[in-house]
Amino acid sequence: MDSGDQEHERGITIPAKQTSIFYGDYKINIIDTPGHADFSGEVERTLNMADGVLLIVDAQEGPMPQTKFVLAKALELGLKPVVIINKIDKPARRIAEVEDELSDLFLELATDDSQLQYPIYYAIGRDGKSWKEIPANTDEDADLTPIFDAIINDIPAPDVMEDGAFQLLVTSLQYDTFQGKYAIGRIARGSVKRGLQVSLMKNGEVAGSARIEKVFGYRGLNREELDEAFAGDIVALVGVADAHIGDTIADKEQPEALPTIDIEAPTLSMYLGPNTSTMKGREGEFTTSRKIGDRLKRELETNVALRVEENGIGFTISGRGELHLSV
């Protein structure tokens, strides 16, 4: 699902992404979040669309520092965990030790006793294989059925209201030159279709109105237009140009705000200004304070963990770490 140039270059997930698949009679929404703590804002803004979490851990490396952060956030929200120990075909695998490390991690982070009971599955993700028990031979035929069954059996269905007026919390924004801005979120109540008149709510107050021009859903790696979407669906709405992350989009006849997204404060700051060297104007794409400001303003629309303050001819940028700021 990683599609950005920097994601391919660095081999990491940066912005969270969403899709859906169908398994039997079930539609499963999937959210891919970054693992690195520097992109924790992406985790915080998207976890409220989830009902459970697949915690994927390397069979050799075990839980990493970023594993602790993501799991802590998931458990704070009461999400049901399903543990997957991946890459069990590695020669240096240490499955028993990794299970003990996971047990210690859950003991440290669990907010109630029920979170100490979690299913563990074993997988070779590259080959599309998974097992409920450690296989005697990883070359045997297998598929991902055990994990899909775990999602159905162990993770609860969305806690949404099928009836009532439409309500959605914006958790992500995307753009393209054809449709403009997409406001993305999970429908918390009711349904939405093209032509619906909605109110845009900021900080619990109505801040404007709009008309839904198009409704898109996600399936596989594609975004597809829908006639109508219902409570529990993750959708992208076109027509609400003034929407920002944390806003509520609600039926104009019954505008009720959802709780906004809580994002932790930045931990690191840097100063960024225009080039003042003798090479100014000869290199770089954004060489003036105005161009830098415009670019940072666009970044703030989607990067919820970033803070920008104008400081003379430059800007003080605050984020979650060196990797976050460098990206």
Where are the regions a protein language model picked out?
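Structural and coupling elements of P-loop NTPases
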Residues: M1-V327
